[in-house]
């Protein structure tokens, strides 16, 4: 094992000198043992001449001094993978941070892996059922696809993510991996405790590199989570759900690292390698003939500017977008998904079938018409509308309420049992409302129920 000596430390950037001919490869991991016995992992980023490498630290560089010895591991950062990591919380280098002792996994993967080869990819466009009505009907997720989850603070991103993890774990016996990238430590802590309470933790691996950590950790933690998910896909042939919260922080950390390495900034001060870094991550998230990694990525939009290079680069990779709206949350409709703003590439009759497609378009049409009429209603009131428009408004309001659904993970707050709604029941319910079969039922019957049969039964309790 080659050893070098630390020659310079500037924040998270550490230069190490090696003997001639012993330079580590780019992306190789080095370990430094501090005076208190703790180990620090560094990742090679640049070769500076014949004998010096510049590296980025995965933790704080407190306690490092010039002249310290750094050992080259000869390979990139390795993280534990397999079923042993389920129910555990790890950091970027795969060390447990949940106080439950070491992770006794038999296998480890490098965090830098090549994307699957072209001939290994599955070309079949297939829908991924989530059991959440508004998503399955209007912006269906594709198996092995990438979905962007947009929303401000407090509109229900985390609850939606937890419900997806719960549904995949219980209905499809699937595993989930959650990568917390540069978000608040408090949110990660809340998620950890809520997952333990709701019982979904045993089917989930959590990897965190939060906003108090150096940029090296934040720029790599998404790759750590992805490697864990890839193991389940490639070795066990499973369909895995990968959550990244927040993909913008991944770009932001890359920008910090780039500046520290002295690269010339690109548009809006971002790194010149922005699209390459995003592409390397997103290209690995895909379906193969063995299994799939389906990802849901929360995306923070800086200053609500969708043309900012960071969200704009992420958009090019997405198959579907789920937009959470504060206006809908204010109506008390949860999940607060905006049915008109959210999109999906597979909302296509050739993929999902004519029945599903026609129902989804009819729902969007009636909601759009209701939206157009809202100004008239606000100024003149309902009485000024034609009879046809009154009927449209009545049905649209029922549709809007029927898009809400009680969640398993929110049972403690709503007092209602959670519901997983199968796609055929979702389509059947909305078709009946639009066809006018339930015009005689009050709006309240459709609020926070699962299937249309439950709405009909609820009338008796009102």
UniProtKB/Swiss-Prot annotation:
It is a peripheral membrane protein. ATP binds at residues 151-158. SMART domains: AAA (SM00382). It comes from the Bacteria. Pfam families: ATP-synt_ab, ATP-synt_ab_N, ATP-synt_VA_C. The keyword NAD does not apply. Its EC number is 7.1.2.2. One of its GO terms (cellular component) is proton-transporting ATP synthase complex. It is found in: Cell inner membrane. Keywords: ATP synthesis, ATP-binding, Cell inner membrane, Cell membrane, CF(1), Hydrogen ion transport, Ion transport, Membrane, Nucleotide-binding, Translocase, Transport. GO terms for molecular function: ATP binding; ATP hydrolysis activity; proton-transporting ATP synthase activity, rotational mechanism. F-type ATPases have 2 components, CF(1) - the catalytic core - and CF(0) - the membrane proton channel. CF(1) has five subunits: alpha(3), beta(3), gamma(1), delta(1), epsilon(1). CF(0) has three main subunits: a(1), b(2) and c(9-12). The alpha and beta chains form an alternating ring which encloses part of the gamma chain. CF(1) is attached to CF(0) by a central stalk formed by the gamma and epsilon chains, while a peripheral stalk is formed by the delta and b chains. Belongs to the ATPase alpha/beta chains family. HAMAP family: ATP_synth_beta_bact. Produces ATP from ADP in the presence of a proton gradient across the membrane. The catalytic sites are hosted primarily by the beta subunits. This is ATP synthase subunit beta. The lineage of its organism: Bacteria, Pseudomonadati, Chlorobiota, Chlorobiia, Chlorobiales. The gene is atpD.
């Amino acid at each position: 094992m080659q050893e070098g000596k630390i020659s310079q430390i500037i924040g998270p950037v550490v230069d190490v000198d090696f003997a001639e001919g012993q330079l580590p490869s780019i992306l190789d991991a080095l370990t430094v043992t501090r005076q208190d016995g703790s180990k620090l992992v560094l990742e090679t980023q640049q070769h500076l001449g014949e004998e010096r490498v510049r590296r980025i630290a995965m933790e704080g560089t407190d306690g490092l001094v010039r002249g310290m010895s750094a050992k080259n591991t000869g390979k990139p950062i390795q993280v534990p993978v397999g079923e042993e990591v389920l129910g555990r919380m790890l950091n970027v280098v795969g060390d447990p941070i949940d106080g439950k002792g070491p992770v006794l996994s038999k296998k480890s993967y490098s965090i830098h892996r090549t994307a699957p080869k072209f001939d290994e990819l599955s070309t079949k466009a297939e829908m991924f059922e989530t059991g959440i009505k508004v998503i399955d009907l209007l912006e269906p997720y594709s198996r092995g696809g990438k979905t962007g989850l947009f929303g401000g603070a407090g509109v229900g991103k985390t609850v939606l993510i937890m419900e997806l993890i719960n549904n995949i774990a219980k209905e499809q016996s699937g595993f989930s991996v959650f990568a917390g990238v540069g978000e608040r430590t408090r949110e990660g802590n809340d998620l950890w405790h809520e997952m333990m309470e709701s019982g979904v933790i045993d089917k989930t691996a959590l990897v965190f590199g939060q906003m108090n950590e150096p940029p090296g950790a934040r720029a790599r933690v998404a790759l750590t989570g992805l490697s864990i998910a890839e193991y389940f896909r490639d070795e066990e042939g499973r369909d895995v759900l990968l959550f990244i919260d927040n993909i913008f922080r991944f770009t932001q950390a890359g920008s910090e690292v780039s500046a520290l390495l002295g690269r010339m900034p690109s548009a809006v001060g971002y790194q010149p390698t922005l699209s390459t870094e995003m592409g390397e991550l997103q290209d690995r998230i895909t379906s193969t003939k063995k299994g799939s990694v389906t990802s849901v990525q929360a995306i923070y939009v800086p200053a609500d500017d969708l043309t900012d290079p960071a969200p704009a680069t992420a958009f090019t990779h997405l198959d579907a977008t789920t937009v959470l709206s504060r206006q809908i949350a204010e109506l008390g409709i949860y999940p607060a998904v905006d049915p008109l703003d959210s999109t999906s590439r597979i909302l296509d009759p050739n993929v999902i079938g004519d029945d599903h497609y026609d129902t989804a378009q009819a729902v969007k049409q009636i909601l759009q018409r209701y939206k157009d009429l809202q100004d008239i209603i606000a100024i003149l009131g309902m009485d000024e509308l034609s009879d046809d428009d009154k009927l449209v408004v009545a049905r649209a309001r029922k549709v809007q309420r029927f898009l809400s659904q009680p969640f398993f993970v929110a049972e403690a707050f709503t007092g209602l049992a959670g519901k997983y709604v199968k796609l055929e029941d979702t389509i059947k319910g909305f078709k009946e409302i639009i066809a006018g079969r339930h015009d005689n039922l009050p709006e309240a019957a459709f609020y926070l129920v699962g299937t249309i049969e439950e709405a009909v039964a609820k009338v008796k309790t009102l």
